[in-house]
Amino acid sequence: MTDVTIKTLAAERQTSVERLVQQFADAGIRKSADDSVSAQEKQTLIDHLNQKNSGPDKLTLQRKTRSTLNIPGTGGKSKSVQIEVRKKRTFVKRDPQEAERLAAEEQAQREAEEQARREAEESAKREAQQKAEREAAEQAKREAAEQAKREAAEKDKVSNQQDDMTKNAQAEKARREQEAAELKRKAEEEARRKLEEEARRVAEEARRMAEENKWTDNAEPTEDSSDYHVTTSQHARQAEDESDREVEGGRGRGRNAKAARPKKGNKHAESKADREEARAAVRGGKGGKRKGSSLQQGFQKPAQAVNRDVVIGETITVGELANKMAVKGSQVIKAMMKLGAMATINQVIDQETAQLVAEEMGHKVILRRENELEEAVMSDRDTGAAAEPRAPVVTIMGHVDHGKTSLLDYIRSTKVASGEAGGITQHIGAYHVETENGMITFLDTPGHAAFTSMRARGAQATDIVVLVVAADDGVMPQTIEAIQHAKAAGVPVVVAVNKIDKPEADPDRVKNELSQYGILPEEWGGESQFVHVSAKAGTGIDELLDAILLQAEVLELKAVRKGMASGAVIESFLDKGRGPVATVLVREGTLHKGDIVLCGFEYGRVRAMRNELGQEVLEAGPSIPVEILGLSGVPAAGDEVTVVRDEKKAREVALYRQGKFREVKLARQQKSKLENMFANMTEGEVHEVNIVLKADVQGSVEAISDSLLKLSTDEVKVKIIGSGVGGITETDATLAAASNAILVGFNVRADASARKVIEAESLDLRYYSVIYNLIDEVKAAMSGMLSPELKQQIIGLAEVRDVFKSPKFGAIAGCMVTEGVVKRHNPIRVLRDNVVIYEGELESLRRFKDDVNEVRNGMECGIGVKNYNDVRTGDVIEVFEIIEIQRTIA
């Protein structure tokens, strides 16, 4: 046998190199991974493993078999006797040295028998050959004698007859020789057949012994120890069944015994227990009643903890997690309580929590990504490879009323601001403008504080931010917020100093204020371009456009024009006649009419596309804003728009996203922890203002909801019962009536059926077109729900000059009113050395023995304090009243 390396041997044995090296070390042989192993070292390792993994020397098997025997008794009744047969077998394992010695003796005996057999065969061959030779010689002698007699008798025959006789004799001799050779060949074949049968018998015996002892040669240590009892018990049980079968063979010669005897080659042969049960049934009597049971001892592995591979999705309930780990739900809840979280068996937990619990209980966690379908749909898109220059997307940002829309208005030469309520931009407007030097796409964002999220979306979807600052107003709160959004998005800023034509304009002050927030002009060594413009007079507009195009040229903006389009939702709303409408800004590719789009939780086929002027278009390239129709619902502003191939898969992805959003929302709900329970117990009564909100566009719904929720205080909370895009319907009115809510419509109206419900239920319906008015009126409604503030106001002081005793009232204080007025039945305080020693109320107020209701400053009176008699000279009685002050929401 050639030498092999440790690595090769490890691969053959299907074990690790480190484990094989450790086994060699345990056997006293030091090896590394690249060393070779000789046959002798291999044998040493096998002997070591066999010695290490040898099982117990003695194995005892006990078996019980129970059956019932019915014995006829007196009175015609049979008596049942329980019979229990106990058997005990002990199997002793031979010592390895003794086994080797016995094997050597058996081998020597087999060799001796083989040698004797060969000698016997050779001797038989020699005897047969000698016998054949003797017979041939005797036959030859007899034939010679006969021939001599015939020759003597026939001397007179002619010479030709003598020649014929000689030829016949020669032929007969050849025949006899052939018969002798055939006999010899048959003897050799018989000997060879006996040798082959003996060799097959020895090989079969060796193969059977090798199979029985196979576990001692190749199995791993852990496998040996775990399978030993099973294999040994099987062999022992087979041996016992064989011996019992031999004993039983001589007993039953009748029909039942023949029926019970297993047929040769029957794979479904009955076990010993079945045979004993059948014999008990035969002995049971005429009725064939059988009340026997077989108790058979089994060998089972002891129960122990099983570590499993637990596959966990993004969300999972506690019960599902318990099923995956094959444990009871109470054990999982107990483990979560140890980790500091309380949960019920049906509660949805997130992936991180489930991972902690499973690892705490000793299982291996496999985190599953549930968005394989979404990734497959997104990867199956035909996008072109060549990128071409595209138009810049410019967002105009700044404080409210600083002239953003007017500036864009002048650029587009249309009056947009007049259409906006109150002159304030309520949602994002997307327009593209053709100039002499190229095309520019503008996004006009609101400047009011309520529209923070809309400004953030505008900054994320843009390439360049034009920051409009009024020269007469300077930097304002929304200006600072716009700077923060631009920096967060990493977008360059071009500053347009507007209203430069006003007399009080101060551009230098604007530069100084902006420099404090990191916006430095180029002449000061910064990177931002400052352009002085006037949206009213049209001053500096061309310079602003040149600055934008210059900045775009520096950025080297490129996009893929061919292929399937992708973009973002700038705004969305529900049109009564057209259905869901979404304003989409295409980022790359070309969007065609008829494309299948996937947009957040919604999907659909583009039925129509319109530009910002309301004109029908068939396609839109990069940096082009369009309105699309045909979606299944109103998408959320900011969602990604992607063109896909298959509408069915798009629907599946949209439904998956909806379910995922719902599961994550449930998983993130507030958990029932002890501190929350105590907080809920100590929390007082909280008033709620319920509102059902409907607006014209999705961005307005978000902005108004955020602003109203920020108004909530500890005493009064704003609760948005329902919100949506579109007009107020009968469903909205019914919801408001059921939840006692206020109906608020922002740039929308109620339809006829909704108005009937509103009149019948006397609901509070309010329309708004400017967000200021909406927020102010909700503040007023919340202020009315605030509990009034109670304030103590001192109305008079009386100094005790003397104390009198009255049988009816006890101690009466003779007082002089020094300040204000003293009123009867008002609460008072008794002060001694400017320290309050008693607080109560006046019981009696008299002047010249007459009861009076009040005593004014500078007059004397007698005061009786209710339930208090320790009034002394020099005390001061302070009279006050409690007034209510109505609070307001700041």
From Swiss-Prot:
Residues 669-890 are annotated as: 6. It holds the Pfam family GTP_EFTU_D2. SUPFAM superfamilies: Initiation factor IF2/eIF5b, domain 3 (SSF52156), P-loop containing nucleoside triphosphate hydrolases (SSF52540), Putative DNA-binding domain (SSF46955), Translation proteins (SSF50447). Residues 444-447 are annotated as: G3. GO terms for cellular component: cytosol. Its main location: cytoplasm. One of its GO terms (molecular function) is guanosine tetraphosphate binding. The modification N6-acetyllysine is found at K808. Gene3D superfamilies: P-loop containing nucleotide triphosphate hydrolases, Putative DNA-binding domain, N-terminal subdomain of bacterial translation initiation factor IF2, Translation factors, Translation initiation factor IF- 2, domain 3. Keywords: Acetylation, Cytoplasm, GTP-binding, Initiation factor, Nucleotide-binding, Protein biosynthesis. Residues 541-668 are annotated as: 5. It is found in: Cytoplasm. Residues 45-304 are annotated as: Disordered. GTP binds at residues 398-405, 444-448, 498-501. It comes from the Bacteria. PANTHER family: TR-TYPE G DOMAIN-CONTAINING PROTEIN (PTHR43381:SF5), TRANSLATION INITIATION FACTOR IF-2-RELATED (PTHR43381). One of the essential components for the initiation of protein synthesis. Protects formylmethionyl-tRNA from spontaneous hydrolysis and promotes its binding to the 30S ribosomal subunits. Also involved in the hydrolysis of GTP during the formation of the 70S ribosomal complex. Belongs to the TRAFAC class translation factor GTPase superfamily. Classic translation factor GTPase family. IF-2 subfamily. This is Translation initiation factor IF-2. It comes from Escherichia coli O6:H1 (strain CFT073 / ATCC 700928 / UPEC). The lineage of its organism: Bacteria, Pseudomonadati, Pseudomonadota, Gammaproteobacteria, Enterobacterales.
